[in-house]
Amino acid sequence: MSKIYVLDTNVLLQDPNAIFSFEENEVVIPAVVLEEVDSKKRYMDEVGRNARHVSKLIDALRQKGRLHEHVPLDTGGTLRIELNHRSFHQLQEIFIEKTNDNRILAVAKNLSLEEETKENGRPVILVSKDVLVRVKADAIGLLAEDFLNDRVVDNDEMYSGYKDLYISQQLFSSFYGKNQISVNDVKQHAFYPNQFALMKDELGGSSSAVGIADKTGTVLKRLVFDDEHIWGIRPKNVQQTMALELLLREDIPLVTLIGKAGTGKTLLALAAGLLQTEDLGIYKKLVVARPIVPVGKDIGYLPGEKEEKLKPWMQPIFDNLEFLFNAKKPGELDAILAGIGSIQVEALTYIRGRSIPDQFIIIDEAQNLTRHEVKTLLTRVGEGSKIVLMGDPEQIDHPYLDSLNNGLAYVVERFKGQPISGSVKLLKGERSGLAQLAADLL
C-alpha cells in the first residue's frame, strides 16, 4: 500500500532533494512550508542556499503538471502542494496558537482523517526533523517520523579507524622482525587503507603491538611515529598514539579525529601543526578555524574589531596554544603569535571559499558543518596542504544536524576506504577525573 508523506520545512532546508527520497509514494508539501522556505531564501548561509535550491526544484516540477494536483516524480511517486485541509478544528482544544508548526500538523491530521473515511485509505505520515513536532503529532494520533535518509551510518557503527586483532606469537615475531605482516596471514580480517590494528596475543599473553594498514590495505606496518615527543607533549594512550601517527604523516593529507572534550584532539593537532610548520618547515602556515556562531549568523553583527569578536569563540584554541608556548602572562601569547606570523586563528567564515595551498589546516568543532559546507571546504584545499577535521558528533549546536548526518560523520564514512585519509576515534579523556566523569555522565 502506498503512503502519503507530509514534509515539514526543516526536512527541505536540511536536504533539498528530500522530495525524491520517498519512492513510489505521495509527497505533500503544505503551503505554509513554501512560505517558510521563501522567508529563508535571502540568507547567505547553508539554509539560504538550500531554500533557493528547493524553490528551483519545485519550480522545475511545474513543467510536469499542476502542483496543487499530482506532479509525477522520477521515483514513481507524486508531489502535491496542499492548499486545503488547513482547519484547526481537530487541534484547537490541544494546540490553541496558530503557529506554522501547528498549521503543518493541522494539514497532516486533516489529510489523515480524510484517508480514514476511504475504503482503501492510505497512511499519512508527517516527516520532521523537529522532535517536538513529532511529539505533538503523536499526541493527536498522527504518525510521524524523523527524516533518516541523510544519515550516513548508525551511531554504534561509525568507523573508529582501528580494530582489535588477535594473532599468534609467530606473527608477533614476524611483525617485530620485518616491521610488517601480510593481511593474508590474518584469517577473516580485512583492513581499510590507514586503518590501525591493535594486535594482541591470541592465547591471552602480554604481547601487544599497534600496526597500520598500508595504502592498499594488504600489509600491516609498524608505526613511523610510535614514540614521539613533540612540543613538550607525548601521547598518553594508544588512541592518541594513532592520532599522532596520522597527524605527522605527510602522505595522509586528510585526518579526522572524533572524541569527547578532553580526549586531546586539539592539543595533539596543534602540536603536530606547530612541529611541521615552525620546526620542520613542511608547511608555510598553520591555520586553525572553527564554526563559531549559530547557523544564519556571522560575527559581523558583534561590536568591536575582528580580533575582539573572535577571541571569545576561539578561546579553547588560545588556551591550548598558551599551554604549548608556555605563555603565563596576559598578552604574552598575542605577542608570540604576532612575532611568528605563520599561525593564523580564524573563524571558518573567513577561510571558506579561499584556495589554501601548503598549509596545515585544523578545523575544530567540525560536527557543526553540513555536508555541503564540508565539501566546499575540502574542495578548496590546495596542493601540498594537510587538513584535520575534528569534533564530537554527540555535541551538535546546528539546528538541522544530529550525530549521524553532520559533515564530520559524513567525511569519516565517505573517506574511510581512501588511501589519502585516516581517522581515529579517541575514547579516553586525559583531563582531570572530574572532567572525564562529567563528559561521560552529563
Curated annotation (Swiss-Prot):
Domain of life: Bacteria
Record: residues binding ATP: G259, K260, A261, G262, T263, G264, K265, T266
E.C. number: 3.1.-.-, 5.6.2.5
Keywords: ATP-binding, GTP-binding, Helicase, Hydrolase, Isomerase, Magnesium, Metal-binding, Nuclease, Nucleotide-binding
Cystine residue pairs: none
Summary of the function given for this chain in its UniProt record: Unwinds and/or cleaves 5'-tailed RNA in vitro. Has ATPase and GTPase activities. Unlike the protein in mycobacteria there does not seem to be an antitoxin gene upstream, suggesting this is not a toxin-antitoxin system.
Similarity annotation: In the N-terminal section; belongs to the PINc/VapC protein family.
Record's protein name: Protein PhoH2
Organism: Bacillus subtilis (strain 168)
Taxonomic lineage of the native organism: Bacteria, Bacillati, Bacillota, Bacilli, Bacillales
